[in-house]
C-alpha cells in the first residue's frame, strides 16, 4: 500500500518501476488483494459517521418518547378532570323538587337508624378529642410546605380567602405537584381577586383585514391560556365569573360558607375550605381524601358515591372539626388522606390516629380484613370504544408572504365535555373505517363546518395529503382510537371566499402558527397530534440526508472499484497479448484511481460528510453557472 500511495503522491516516481511491477503477475495479485482490503476498510470507516448519526437520532428519539409518555400521564389526569366536569354539569342541571327532598330526609333518617342511632353519636366525645389533638399535633410537624399555606394578617383575610379559593379549584382532580407551578404563575399575574376581576376569559385580537381567520400572533394570554395544561377548563371559567361577581358586589368577599355558596362556581366543599381556613369558621370539608379517612376511622363499607352515604360523611366531618382551629384541622384531615392514609398503601404505623381507627383494629384482629377494604371500591363500567379521524389542516397563503403555514383550529361548544376548548377538525365515527371512508368524512365535515361557498378543490389547491398515523386516547369511560392525517393546502384566492359565512362575534375557528399552539387552551388529545407531524418531518429530513450520503459514498466506492478493475484488466490483458494502444493509457488510469483514492481518504480523515460535500459542490456549480463561467 505504501508503494501504491507513493505512485499517487510522488510525481517523480520512476516509470520503469511501474513498468516492472506491471509485468509481474505476483504484483498484480498483491495489488488486487490490497485494493480489496482497502475497500473493505474504507467502507467500514465511511459508515462509521452515519452509524454515529443514527445512534444520536435513536437516543434523541428515546428522549422524545419519554417526554411523550410523561405528557400522556398528565393528559390522563386532565381527562379525568374533564370527565368530572361532565358529571358536574349533569348534577348541576338536575334540580331537586321539594317532594324529593322530603323523601330523602325520610330515607336519611332510616339510614341513620340502621347505623345505630343518630350520626352525631358515632364518635364519642373522648374519641373526638383524641382525633382532634392527634391530627393537629401531627399536622404542625409534618405539613407540606405549599405556596397557598402562607399565613396572612387579619387585614389580609380577603387575600388569604382568594388564595385558598384558587388553590382549591386547581387541586380538584389534579396532583399537588402539577398545581404548584400553575398556582405560582397565576398569582403572579392576578395577585388579588380584583386583578382577576379585570381579566377576560379569552381576548382574541383578530385582524380586521380581509382575512379574519389569520391572527397576527398578538393574542393575549388570559384565563384559559394561563390554565392551559391543567384541564377541566370549566373551573377557570367559574373562577373568573365568581371573581367578577364578588368584585361587582358591595359587601366585599363573603366570609361565611352559606354566603360563599351563592358565588358562581363555589360549592359546599370549596365554601367550607375558604370559610374555615381564611375566616376561621367551624365548618367541615369533605373530599375524596377525607371520605377515605372517615370511612376507615369508623369502618364504613358503604358506597361513598351513594348520596345518603355522602351526607353521613359530611355529618361525621362536622362533628370532628375543631372549633378553635377549624382551618388547620380540615387541612390536617386532607393531608392525612393524601400522604399516609392512601388508597392502596396506607402507612398505619405512622398514622397519628391509628389507635382510634376501627378499620385498623379489625385488620389486627382478623388477617383476612384489610384497611384498604374501606371504603368500598366502586366497580367502574367498561369504557366503550369509538373512533375519531383528525385532520391537521395547514393553510399557506402566498399573498401575505408568510414564512410558514398556519393550522386551523375549531372551537368546541360552550356546554358539555371539553367545553370551549380548541381542537383540530375532527369527526367521530360509529365504527372502524378504512382510509377512503375516513377521508370522505373529513371532506364532508370541512365543507359543512367552514361553510364553504365553493368546492374545496376550487377554493384552494391541495399541496399534499397523507396519513400520519394513529394513537389511542383513554377517557374515563371511552377508549378512543384516533386516526391523524395532514392536509396541506395553498389558497388560490382571497380568504374571504374560504370562510365567508363566519362572523367575528361568532368566531368558532381560527388559524394559528405552530408556536401559538402550545399557548392555547387545547384538549389533551389535540396536544398528542402535533408530535405526529414533527416526527414525520424529522423522519423525512433524516431519510433524505442519510440517502444522499449513502449515494455519494457508494458512488465514490464504485468509482474506485471500477477503476481498479479496469486497471487490472488492462495489465492482465497486456501479459497475455502485448498492448498496442496508447502506452500511457494504463498510467493515466492508475493515476485516476489514486486521485480518487486520495480524495476519498482525505474526506474521511477530515471528517467531511459526503452529503455536506455534495451540497457545497452543487452550490459551487450553481454559482459558476449563474456567473456564466460554465
From Swiss-Prot:
Enzyme Commission designation: 3.2.2.31
Compartments, as annotated in UniProt: Nucleus
Active site: 168 (proton donor/acceptor)
Molecular-function GO terms, alphabetical: 4 iron, 4 sulfur cluster binding; metal ion binding; purine-specific mismatch base pair DNA N-glycosylase activity
Cofactor note: Binds 1 [4Fe-4S] cluster. The cluster does not appear to play a role in catalysis, but is probably involved in the proper positioning of the enzyme along the DNA strand.
Cofactor field: [4Fe-4S] cluster
Location of the region described as Disordered in the Swiss-Prot/TrEMBL record: 54-123
TM ranges: none
Residues holding [4Fe-4S] cluster: 341, 348, 351, 357
GO aspect biological process, one term: base-excision repair
Motif (Nudix box): 427-451
SMART domains, per the entry: ENDO3c (SM00478)
Compositional bias ranges of the Acidic residues kind: 73-123
Free-text function comment from the UniProt entry: Involved in oxidative DNA damage repair. Initiates repair of A*oxoG to C*G by removing the inappropriately paired adenine base from the DNA backbone. Possesses both adenine and 2-OH-A DNA glycosylase activities.
PANTHER family associated with the record: ADENINE DNA GLYCOSYLASE (PTHR42944:SF1)
Protein name (Swiss-Prot/TrEMBL): Adenine DNA glycosylase
Organism, as annotated: Arabidopsis thaliana
Gene from which the chain derives: MYH
Amino acid at each position: 500500500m505504501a508503494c501504491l500511495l507513493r505512485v499517487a503522491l510522488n510525481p517523480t516516481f520512476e516509470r520503469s518501476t511501474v513498468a516492472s511491477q506491471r509485468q509481474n503477475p505476483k504484483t498484480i495479485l498483491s495489488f488486487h488483494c490490497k485494493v480489496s482490503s482497502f475497500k473493505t476498510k474504507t467502507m467500514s470507516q465511511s459508515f462509521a459517521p452515519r452509524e454515529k448519526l443514527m445512534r444520536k437520532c435513536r437516543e434523541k428519539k428515546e428522549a422524545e418518547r419519554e417526554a411523550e409518555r410523561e405528557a400522556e400521564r398528565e393528559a390522563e389526569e386532565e381527562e379525568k378532570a374533564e370527565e368530572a366536569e361532565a358529571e358536574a354539569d349533569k348534577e348541576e342541571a338536575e334540580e331537586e323538587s321539594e317532594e324529593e327532598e322530603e323523601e330523602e330526609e325520610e330515607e336519611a333518617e332510616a339510614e341513620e337508624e340502621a347505623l345505630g342511632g343518630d350520626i352525631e353519636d358515632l364518635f364519642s366525645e373522648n374519641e373526638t378529642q383524641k382525633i382532634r389533638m392527634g391530627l393537629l399535633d401531627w399536622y404542625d410537624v409534618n405539613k407540606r410546605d405549599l405556596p397557598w399555606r402562607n399565613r396572612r394578617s387579619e387585614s389580609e383575610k380577603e387575600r388569604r380567602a382568594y388564595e385558598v379559593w384558587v388553590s382549591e379549584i386547581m387541586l380538584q382532580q389534579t396532583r399537588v405537584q402539577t398545581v404548584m407551578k400553575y398556582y405560582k404563575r397565576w398569582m403572579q399575574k392576578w395577585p388579588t381577586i380584583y386583578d382577576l376581576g379585570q381579566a377576560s376569559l379569552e381576548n382574541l385580537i383578530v385582524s380586521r383585514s380581509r382575512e379574519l381567520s389569520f391572527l397576527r400572533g398578538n393574542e393575549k394570554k388570559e384565563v384559559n391560556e394561563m390554565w392551559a395544561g391543567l384541564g377541566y377548563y370549566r373551573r377557570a371559567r367559574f373562577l373568573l365569573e365568581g371573581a367578577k361577581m364578588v368584585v361587582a358586589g358591595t359587601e366585599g368577599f363573603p366570609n361565611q360558607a352559606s354566603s360563599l355558596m351563592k358565588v358562581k362556581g363555589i360549592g359546599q366543599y370549596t365554601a367550607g375550605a375558604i370559610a374555615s381556613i381564611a375566616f376561621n369558621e367551624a365548618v367541615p370539608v369533605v373530599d375524596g381524601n377525607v371520605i377515605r379517612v372517615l370511612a376507615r376511622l369508623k369502618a364504613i363499607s358503604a358506597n361513598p358515591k351513594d348520596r345518603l352515604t355522602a351526607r353521613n360523611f359530611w355529618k361525621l366531618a362536622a362533628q370532628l372539626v375543631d372549633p378553635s382551629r377549624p382551618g388547620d384541622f380540615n387541612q390536617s384531615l386532607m393531608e392525612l388522606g393524601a400522604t399516609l392514609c392512601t388508597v392502596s398503601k396506607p402507612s398505619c404505623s405512622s398514622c397519628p390516629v391509628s389507635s382510634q381507627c376501627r378499620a385498623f383494629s379489625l385488620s389486627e384482629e382478623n388477617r383476612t380484613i384489610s384497611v384498604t377494604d374501606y371504603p368500598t371500591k366502586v366497580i367502574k363500567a367498561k369504557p366503550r370504544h369509538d373512533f375519531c379521524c383528525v385532520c391537521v389542516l395547514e393553510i399557506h397563503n402566498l399573498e401575505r408572504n408568510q414564512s410558514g403555514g398556519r393550522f386551523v383550529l375549531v372551537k368546541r361548544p360552550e356546554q358539555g365535555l371539553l367545553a370551549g376548548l380548541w381542537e383540530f377538525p375532527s369527526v367521530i365515527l360509529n365504527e372502524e373505517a378504512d382510509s377512503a371512508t375516513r377521508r370522505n368524512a373529513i371532506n364532508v365535515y370541512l365543507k359543512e363546518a367552514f361553510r364553504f361557498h365553493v368546492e374545496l378543490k376550487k377554493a384552494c389547491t391541495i399541496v399534499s395529503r397523507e396519513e400520519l398515523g394513529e394513537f389511542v386516547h383513554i377517557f374515563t369511560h371511552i377508549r378512543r382510537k384516533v386516526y391523524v392525517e395532514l392536509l396541506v393546502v395553498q389558497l388560490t384566492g382571497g380568504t374571504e371566499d374560504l370562510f365567508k359565512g363566519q362572523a367575528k362575534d361568532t368566531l368558532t375557528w381560527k388559524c394559528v402558527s405552530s408556536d401559538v399552539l402550545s399557548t392555547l387552551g387545547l384538549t389533551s388529545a389535540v396536544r398528542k397530534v402535533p408530535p405526529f407531524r414533527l416526527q414525520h418531518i424529522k423522519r423525512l429530513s433524516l431519510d433524505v440526508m442519510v440517502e444522499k450520503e449513502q449515494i455519494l459514498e457508494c458512488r465514490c466506492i464504485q468509482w474506485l472499484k471500477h477503476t481498479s478493475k479496469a486497471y487490472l484488466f488492462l495489465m492482465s490483458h497486456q501479459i497475455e497479448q502485448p498492448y498496442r494502444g496508447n502506452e500511457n493509457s494504463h498510467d493515466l488510469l492508475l493515476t485516476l484511481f489514486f486521485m480518487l483514492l486520495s480524495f476519498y481518504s482525505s474526506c474521511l480523515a477530515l471528517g467531511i460528510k459526503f452529503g455536506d460535500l455534495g451540497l457545497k459542490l452543487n452550490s459551487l456549480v450553481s454559482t459558476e453557472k449563474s456567473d456564466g463561467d460554465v
